[in-house]
Amino acid sequence: MIETDAVVIGAGPVGLFQAFQLGLQGIGAHLIDALPQAGGQCVTLYGDKPIYDIAGIPVCTGRELIDRLLAQLAPFKPHWHLNTLVAALAPQPDARLLLETDTGARLLARSVFIAAGVGAFVPRTLKMAGMERFVGTQLFYQVLPAGMDVTGRQVIVHGGDEGAVACAVELAEQGRAARVSLLYRRDLFQAPEALLQRLQRLRAAGRIAVEVGQITGIASSGMPQCSTLRALQVVDAQGASHALPVDVLVAVLGISPRLGPLTDWGMAMARKQLQVDTEAFRTSVPGIYAVGDINTYPGKRRLILCGFHEATLAAFAAAEALKGDKVALQYTTTSAHLHRLLGVAPASGATGP
């Protein structure tokens, strides 16, 4: 059992800023996200698209914004639970909140901040009978597990977007796999030009094989409960079928949002969004706050900068609830206390305890 003052569900831009604002209040946080990396849809869907309405930043991409937020958050050393879904959330007799994840972790928190956007983004899966047997051993969605050894193995990356191309290119450049194939329904990929040029160079050198076609079946060996994936049956544009040997399959098919069990946690909702007050962005369940696109209130605007405002007020409210007293307003420009929390040298003229 992990006991903590705060859990933030969702590691998109608003969730990251929520953890930062909690850090300024001296509150450590655990961050949980369904994706294998921080950033939410800001990275996964809009990583290379420009954002023009973040205060003080004339323009940045979604990925650049997340990189800046992660750097800003770094001094507070949050605890990460990535590739993880919250399966259950329930108030306890002592007013704390018990969270259970799909990985088996249990967290007992004094406050919970839901920054889940339009829901937990989960990978789109292959809709093919029998594929589920290989998930986590030979079949992986979106990314390979960190540190996985593919030496001497035949790896197929299935997908046509930037994530798929990047995965195949990285594997080929590492040079450990016996063969790297990029499988997609057509020989046209959606990725930045620089990445496509790397792909072309690797193709020309014979280090990546691009396979055009669609998966229609699989070949495996062994008993059903302990079988091994051996090959994919693929049909090309001309209708010809052939087998592609495979040891490791990485399916990069995009992601889709899912509210999941959130609707069962007893909070008041309207049109699939959590109803909150505008003083502290509290939900109808004590100790649970909701910020960003997941919440709704009169005048709501689904903008990142509005989520930053909500996260700030929620952090102040939670700090007062946890400490049982009003929280003094301090400024990062002058507060020696905040400078110590941030690990920065005091500015000239800084004051405070």
From Swiss-Prot:
Enzyme Commission number(s) from the entry: 1.18.1.2
Keyword terms of this UniProt record: FAD, Flavoprotein, NADP, Oxidoreductase
Residues binding FAD, per UniProt: D33, Q41, Y46, V86, F121, D293, T333
Pfam families from the UniProt entry: Pyr_redox_2
CC cofactor note: Binds 1 FAD per subunit.
Catalytic activity: 2 reduced [2Fe-2S]-[ferredoxin] + NADP(+) + H(+) = 2 oxidized [2Fe-2S]-[ferredoxin] + NADPH
GO molecular function list: ferredoxin-NADP+ reductase activity; flavin adenine dinucleotide binding; NADP binding
Family label: Belongs to the ferredoxin--NADP reductase type 2 family.
Subunit structure: Homodimer.
Protein name: Ferredoxin--NADP reductase
Gene source species: Verminephrobacter eiseniae (strain EF01-2)
